[in-house]
Curated annotation (Swiss-Prot):
Belongs to the major facilitator superfamily. It comes from Saccharomyces cerevisiae (strain ATCC 204508 / S288c) (Baker's yeast). Gene3D superfamilies: MFS general substrate transporter like domains (1.20.1250.20). It comes from the Eukaryota. Pfam families: MFS_1. PANTHER family: BYPASS OF STOP CODON PROTEIN 6 (PTHR23514:SF3). The modification Phosphoserine is found at residues 37, 41. It is found in: Golgi apparatus, cis-Golgi network membrane. Glycans are attached at residue 49. Residues 1-72, 166-167, 227-232, 322-340, 395-397, 461-462 are lumenal. The lineage of its organism: Eukaryota, Fungi, Dikarya, Ascomycota, Saccharomycotina. Probable transporter. This is Bypass of stop codon protein 6. InterPro entries: MFS (IPR011701), MFS_dom (IPR020846), MFS_trans_sf (IPR036259), MFS_Transporter (IPR051788).
């Protein structure tokens, strides 16, 4: 390669890439890096106050345009943020739609709970496909291609679902491409927000808050469409947001090409090599040390425990959100509209917890581990009340108010556990394992988010749906126990515990 192709260091430019071209992952690298910490605390007035910050660079015969990830000075970044916020509304609705429609699908298609639970497994397969194909998508099509593919998949298959397919297996198959699209959107949104130069934490909270808010309003909305007699038309709502998102994605990501992905990956390789000594021109195209494999990463105690924690956590969270509505209808009341509001209490609490408890953590706890430990015990206490209150059979208004409040508390305290655990994991892991370690843990956690709800469907079918709260309590108790013992297995990082 000639010297003109060697890119300069671009410390002031955020990294969008999910994995580097030489198999060295860099996704979410900037979330807790020291340089980003300095940027996040930088006074906003010191940032350049002009919009002409897009630079054009020659890279392997093509023009690559780079710019700082500052939405205040680069309008294009603001559009990218807006696109991700819109698509996270689709993400939230998608995650709760299956749970809200479970009773309707069982009745409409004359299938069992086990059959309808297969949707969780199919969506997991799509999400895993997204994890395995992210690097290849970015390498060949850039982030722009990945985002357009994701929004396009949502549009096409939401249209199919809106027609109320005559076969349940068509609905089940739609979960695969939807899971693929949502997986791409999830990764892109977190990478973008985590790489912003200003207000990254606030915008990350808003994005995940929109996810929770969308999941919160889904059960009541679905119930109204079911009562109306046209349940499938609910899919027109996420379809609308997907179309708007697609319209915004076109201009927002127009410069996020495959060439830019390759350029940024090469820059990252050069910066990694410079930790040893200043590399020569040809070093940009040399492969750095190969990343450890999946099972090798799991042998690291910090990664294994983090993975197990997410497996149990996502199993408890998604099982509660997906099966709670069906549990209410079959054990408490057949009033779908009224029960949908109680079912929404969990997602309401989760949204409140993720938006508000972050401020509590900063002001009242020494570190994220201690905050998460306290929230985990509060979650366990709330789920204990959930199990006990669920044993009572009553149709009084007071009873349902108490049940609403208890489940709201379950959502509130379980909400911040995922992001806090991720912060702790990144604190104790060496920097070179940040992305690969988190990637493995999220993949394992996603398996829990599909396997446990599926197990809940099997239990509901064989022994009764009344045992769903107990299953969730067991998951919460296990991840609380693991989090309590976590420091005993992680040596040399006492300052974080």
């Amino acid at each position: 390669m000639d010297a003109s192709s060697v890119p300069p260091k671009v410390d002031d430019y955020g990294m969008y890439t999910t994995e580097i071209s030489h198999h060295n992952p860099i996704e979410l690298k900037n979330l807790l890096s020291s340089s980003d910490s300095r940027r996040n605390s930088q006074d906003e007035d010191s940032l350049p106050n002009n919009t002409n910050l897009i630079k054009e660079i020659d890279w392997q015969g093509e023009k690559v345009k780079t710019y700082p990830l500052n939405y205040q000075t680069v309008p294009l970044v603001k559009l990218q943020v807006i696109a991700c916020l819109i698509m996270f509304v689709v993400f939230g609705m998608n995650d709760q739609t299956v749970g809200a429609l479970l009773p309707t699908l069982i009745e409409y298609y004359h299938i069992s709970r086990v059959d309808v639970s297969n949707v969780f497994i199919v969506q997991l397969c799509g999400y895993v496909m997204a994890s395995l194909s992210k690097e290849r998508l970015n390498k060949h099509f850039g982030m722009r291609g990945g985002m357009l593919l994701a929004a396009g998949l949502c549009i096409v298959f939401l249209i199919i679902l809106a027609t109320a397919p005559s076969s349940f297996y068509v609905c089940m198959f739609c979960g695969l491409p939807l899971g693929l699209g949502i997986g791409i959107l999830d990764s892109t949104g977190n990478v973008l927000m985590g790489s912003l130069l200003v207000h990254k934490n606030e915008l990350m909270g808003i994005m995940h808050g929109l996810y929770g808010a969308a999941a919160m309003v889904t059960p009541p909305l679905v119930s109204y469409f079911v009562e109306w007699g046209h349940w499938s038309l609910f899919f027109l709502i996420p379809l609308f947001f997907s179309i708007i998102g697609m319209i915004v994605i076109f201009p927002a990501f127009k410069f996020e090409t495959a060439s830019k992905y390759d350029y940024l990956c090469s820059v990252e390789n050069k910066e990694s090599n410079n930790d040893v000594e200043e590399a020569g021109d040809n070093s940009l195209m040399e492969s750095t040390k190969a990343s450890p494999g999946f099972f090798e990463l799991l042998r690291n105690p910090a990664i294994f425990l983090y993975s197990l924690y997410l497996f149990l956590y996502l199993g408890a969270e998604i099982t509660t959100g997906s099966w709670f509505f069906s549990y209410l209808l079959e054990t408490k009341s057949s009033n779908k509209v009224a029960m949908s509001y109680i079912a929404a209490s969990f997602w309401t609490g989760l949204t409140v917890g993720r938006l508000c408890l972050g401020f509590v953590t900063e002001r009242f706890f020494e570190n994220e581990y201690k905050a998460s430990k306290a929230y985990a015990f509060l979650t366990l206490s709330s789920y204990t009340l959930f199990v006990l209150v669920g044993l009572i059979n009553s149709s009084s208004v007071f009873y349902f108010v108490v049940l609403f409040f208890v489940v709201f508390c379950c959502g509130t305290f379980i909400g911040p556990l995922f992001p806090n655990a991720s912060i702790v994991a990144l604190q104790v892991l060496p920097k070179r394992l940040h992305v690969s370690g988190v990637g493995v843990a999220v993949a394992v956690g996603g398996c829990g988010g599909a396997a446990i709800p599926y197990l809940a469907g099997v239990i509901a079918h064989t022994v009764g749906i009344q045992y769903i709260p107990l299953l969730c309590w067991i998951m919460v108790a296990l991840f609380t126990l693991e989090w309590t013992l976590y420091p005993k297995f992680i040596k040399g990082h006492e300052e974080y515990f």
